[in-house]
A protein has these predicted regions:
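Short cysteine-rich clusters marking metal-coordination/redox-active sites
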Residues: 31-34, 50-53
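Glycine-rich anion/phosphate-binding loops
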Residues: 105-111, 136-151
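Residues immediately within or flanking Cys/His clusters that coordinate Zn2+
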Residues: 28, 47
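Conserved catalytic cores of soluble enzyme domains
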Residues: 166-282
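Short, small/acidic-rich helices and loops at N termini and domain boundaries
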Residues: 48-52, 58-59
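A structural preference for short, pocket-lining loop segments at secondary-structure junctions
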Residues: 117-129, 145-169
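Cys/His-rich microdomains that often coordinate metals
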Residues: 37-38, 56-57
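An N-cap/entry alpha-helix motif that binds or orients negatively charged groups
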Residues: 11-21, 29-30, 57-114
Length: 284
């Protein structure tokens, strides 16, 4: 039997080694909530939602646009607007360098994408955050493009939808980034006078200056399940008030229970829900 031990194991090792070499990397994803190992292709087909526990993974802005809008007749607005560096800001590396590297990596000029299109044949203007662009932070370009989205919706007499995914104001632009809170809120005040619906969708995370301005000004505020929503983070609040926060504090379910948001909708149902809401809110 010794020849079996000496011959077969090495052969098996060689075969397994060859198989491993032929298997491409990055085929699997472990769910951070339930630890289930998921095939990435299946996860993508399920809109980045875990088929086992329903956990909503973060999704890119482009994927979300493709998920929400009808395929034909999409028009992007403001895609050539680029941020500047008014403060010549420098932390671990210069702001300009950070911008350039992020723009090249994502092929986006900034953290907000504005697209005119249709949801189930209903005209809409959609503004979607790209969280991978510096944490979806709001600077001058995000503010400008959001106002552009508002103006386009007014011009088209259609609903405005914003999908937020942001850590807040962009510190590298200082006071200019904080001014966008007032700028975007003022634009929505104008928008409301036209009696057109603004639907705000809060995904994980929606924090800081974005949550403290236009993200919470929707006629209808929708959140994705378990999304983190708030101004300061839980650890900051706990260290300030010196108290333990309630279980699930700042999660979508907690906010719904306390009347901060209107509804929680599974990502796989959001397109249908939006079409129904817009039909009721803007029958014309």
């Amino acid at each position: 039997m010794s020849w079996l031990k000496n011959v077969i194991p090495p052969k098996i090792k060689r075969i397994v080694g060859k198989v491993r070499k032929n298997i491409p990397e990055g085929l699997w994803h472990k769910c951070p909530a339930c630890q289930t190992v998921l095939y990435k292709t299946d996860l993508e087909k399920n809109m980045q939602v875990c088929s086992n526990c329903g956990f909503h993974n973060r999704i890119s802005a482009r994927d979300r646009i493709a998920m929400l809008l009808d395929t034909p007749n999409q028009i992007e607005h403001g895609n050539k607007i680029k941020p500047t560096d008014p403060l010549s800001f420098n932390d671990t590396k210069p702001y300009k360098e950070r911008l350039n590297s992020t723009q090249k990596e994502l092929d986006e000029n900034d953290a907000l994408i504005v697209v005119e299109g249709k949801i189930e044949s209903i005209p809409v203007v959609l503004a979607v955050f790209e969280f991978k662009f510096m944490g979806g932070s709001m600077g001058s370009v995000v503010g400008e493009k959001f106002v552009l989205a508002v103006d386009t919706a007014i011009k088209n007499k259609c609903a405005l939808i914003c999908v937020a995914a942001s850590g807040g104001a962009r510190m590298q632009e200082g006071l200019i980034s904080l001014m966008q809170m007032a700028k975007t809120s003022a634009a929505l005040t104008k928008f409301s006078s036209y009696k057109l619906p603004f639907i705000s969708i809060l995904s994980d995370p929606t924090m800081g200056g974005v949550s403290a301005s236009f993200a919470m000004l929707g006629d209808i505020i929708i959140a994705e399940p378990k999304a983190l929503i708030g101004f300061a983070g839980p650890r900051v609040i706990e260290s300030t008030v010196r108290e333990k926060l309630p279980e699930g504090f700042q999660r979508a379910e907690f906010l719904l229970e306390h009347g901060v948001i209107d509804m929680i909708v599974d990502r796989r149902q959001i397109r249908k829900s939006l079409a129904e809401l817009i039909t009721h809110l803007n029958p014309n």
